[in-house]
Amino acid sequence: MDKEETIVTIVGSVLAHEGAEFVYAGKAAECESCKVAKVCHNAKLREGKRYRVVSVRKTKHDCAVHEGGAKAVEVAETIITAVIPTSQATRRTRITYTPVCDDVFCKGYAFCHPDGLTEKGRYVVLEVLGPYSECPKGTKNLKLVEMRPVPT
């Protein structure tokens, strides 16, 4: 697997442990007057993307958004498990993601719309986990895969 690029940012102390995951939601109004907002909202972070904490630094900050303060951490974009058409499911292939299904009431919706995946976003298929035959709608020729966003 490729060496993952890490980004230094600041997260609430509750999330500041290795392995914690979050979806970056952008700045809150309270961030405008914060001295460390530039680090917290690092220009490399992308709204709607899922990140995983890979290491925690000792630095702690007061925070108007996070009760209990915030800590400096290193994060990497998370590997995302999703369902895609078999025709796109080739290891190390770059794809433009389009959800297979848009029915929010479907039991399989979370596989078609996992947190951190963006419609029309560019991703690399890392692993093909196998066929996905559990589609409640009966859609055929689907695979369950692990993907990572294409670095920008």
Swiss-Prot record:
Domain of life: Archaea
InterPro entries: UPF0179 (IPR005369)
Disulphide bridges: none
Pfam family, one: UPF0179
Leader sequence segment: none
Record family assignment: Belongs to the UPF0179 family.
Protein name per UniProt: UPF0179 protein Mlab_1307
